[in-house]
């Protein structure tokens, strides 16, 4: 029977399944951070349970950490408490932790791929919605809640239902200055932020084949913004080259055996998908969101839509509300709107290729005096590599602050946040109301 990539990975991890297609799935890799794990560990203690597979469980500090100083006291009392609790839990249960003093510390969805923890064919979970990032390697990866974190810690399994299959084929030639982030934002805008609900999305096509692993991670990271369970891209030679000689990658005969298996991880040519879309990006321009939802997006050379001309009453009301919150008028260009902040970072766009691209644009230029801009590398290794290449100097010379790794301004959970009604051009994945701080306006 022909199968999709999703079906192949899912079926190979089923421990048992009932007549309603609800399965117990084996989990290959469990990633933890300081925010969604404390209650899970408390429950383990109360039930006198151990962590089932400590060698398949890794933790890092990222959401709450200060990006200005390596000190757990620097992000407030709640953040300090969560980080102290993570240290205690990892020590007690013998889990590897990349704390703020570890050179490998960083955003969980940046460090796992760069260390070779993320491998094709795996099932990967984390108490974070953008776990879909790891799907770029042909791994079935998705976010889970705190009670599910506890279940995986205790059993190394998870109760799951089967999702439907969606295929998005991206074709054409990538125009100059168009990035992977532009491509996925365009797709979200075209199909809608709920178009993926109930689906796992496989991205394919000649455009995807040409993408680097870091670009593929950006695409899969944003699959959740379509409402999808996860995003997937079949592994290929680009994947294998990226993984070769990583710390946790297979080696020797194990590498050869792994390659034999990984080459099987693709959808069969006659596999059936529940939905299929072909997206041509040949004429695409850089994209930017104007509203408070990722599908409220336009090309940089387009005007904000006139909500009075929108037929759908629901979409019209949403657009009107978004314009009010964002302090914008419809039928105007965003290029005429002044910004207060710039944020380069997040699990979507804080890898070395992202920093290289930004540095090319900023070299020998200065940002406006009134703009406060920060660059937050996705990990200690990204920061080290960027400094080796002199990228930090380019950013600093242009007026940016060069920060320590962390989630930073992606979410208003640490000291890096917008003030009321400040406007930010952001590399992050969400432009929800208040996402970067109360009353903050995110593009």
Swiss-Prot record:
Pathway(s) the chain acts in: Amino-acid biosynthesis; L-leucine biosynthesis; L-leucine from 3-methyl-2-oxobutanoate: step 2/4
GO biological process, one term: L-leucine biosynthetic process
Listed Pfam families: Aconitase
Single GO MF descriptor: metal ion binding
Gene3D superfamilies given in the database record: Aconitase, domain 3
Record InterPro entries: 3-IsopropMal_deHydase_lsu, Acnase/IPM_dHydase_lsu_aba_1/3, Acoase/IPM_deHydtase_lsu_aba, Aconitase_4Fe-4S_BS, Aconitase_4Fe-4S_dom, IPM_dehydratase_rel_enz, IPMI_cat
PANTHER family referenced in this protein's UniProt entry, alphabetically: 3-ISOPROPYLMALATE DEHYDRATASE, HOMOACONITASE, MITOCHONDRIAL-RELATED
Name of the protein this chain belongs to: 3-isopropylmalate dehydratase large subunit
Source species of the chain: Buchnera aphidicola subsp. Uroleucon obscurum
Lineage: Bacteria, Pseudomonadati, Pseudomonadota, Gammaproteobacteria, Enterobacterales
